[in-house]
């Protein structure tokens, strides 16, 4: 089954390492830490690359639908909704990034 899934994320640019996992805020958003700076779309590109790896989908399956210039973002990802939801829940439960 192929469909679309909406990801709620919080980006941490200029991090010491790239990592996807943990939650921040209320309602909880998935934390995506990237080494890239928030300049000229570099962080957005790095975020999508890290999410593609974490969810095992292609980079082209992601679309930023809200928050292109902010740290809180909503992304639409094409794929199996049940698998994406399960992976999202799994990543949300990982320890918070410091």
Residue spans of the language-model regions?
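The alpha-helix within a helix-turn-helix
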Residues: 52
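Contiguous, often N-terminal, cationic amphipathic patches that form binding interfaces
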Residues: 1-41, 45-49, 57-59, 63-69, ...
């Amino acid at each position: 089954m192929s469909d679309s899934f909406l990801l709620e994320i919080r980006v941490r640019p200029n991090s010491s390492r790239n990592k996807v996992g943990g939650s921040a805020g209320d309602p909880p958003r998935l934390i995506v830490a990237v080494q890239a700076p928030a300049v000229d779309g570099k962080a957005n590109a790095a975020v999508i690359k890290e999410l593609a790896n974490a969810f095992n989908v292609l980079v082209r399956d992601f679309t930023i639908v809200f928050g292109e210039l902010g740290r809180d973002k909503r992304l639409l990802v094409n794929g199996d909704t049940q698998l994406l939801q399960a992976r999202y829940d799994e990543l949300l439960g990982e320890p918070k990034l410091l």
